[in-house]
């Protein structure tokens, strides 16, 4: 996908500052993790398809310098991180995982938490 110069700069700056490029896993693939619920895996695919259809750049399987791998990274247009919650609640996410992101300067507004068990409405992503 061709990005506008300002969006490309945003992406480049984000990757330079926050992404661990030494970790050699293929980005932009969706790993079928046995530890995730079926609903979680399906919801990730649905969101990725929606982002593709909307021409919004995103990445998956991106290892951050803080060691986290968010479900979906979308540093332009919408929340930077999209996390699909399968068995955990928003409270669980913020109490167990958020501190790693917060230590890198991210805030709660940088996250969109999507419940894997609730039907996704496209407008929820904007």
PLM regions with names:
Residues 79-126:
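Catalytic cores of nucleic-acid endonucleases
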Residues 43, 66-68, 93-97:
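Amphipathic coiled-coil/heptad-repeat helices and related helical stalk/stem segments
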Residues 1-31, 35, 98-99, 116-126:
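Non-catalytic C-terminal interaction segments of nucleic acid-processing enzymes
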Residues 18-63:
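Acidic-basic catalytic patches of nuclease active cores, encompassing PD-(D/E)XK
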Residues 53-56, 74, 103:
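Secondary-structure boundary motif
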Residues 66-82:
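Active-site beta-strand-loop-beta-strand hairpin of nuclease catalytic cores
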């Amino acid at each position: 996908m061709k990005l506008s110069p300002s969006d490309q700069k945003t992406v480049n700056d984000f990757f330079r500052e926050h992404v661990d490029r030494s970790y050699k896993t293929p980005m932009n693939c969706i790993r079928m993790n046995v530890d995730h619920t079926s609903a979680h895996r399906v919801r990730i695919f649905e969101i990725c398809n929606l982002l593709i259809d909307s021409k919004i750049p995103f990445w998956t399987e991106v290892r951050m310098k803080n060691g986290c791998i968010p479900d979906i990274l979308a540093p332009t247009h919408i929340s930077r991180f999209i996390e699909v919650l399968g068995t955990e609640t928003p409270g669980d996410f913020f109490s167990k995982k958020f501190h790693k992101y917060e230590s890198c300067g991210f805030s709660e507004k940088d996250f969109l938490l999507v419940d894997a068990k609730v039907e996704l409405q496209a407008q929820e992503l904007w």
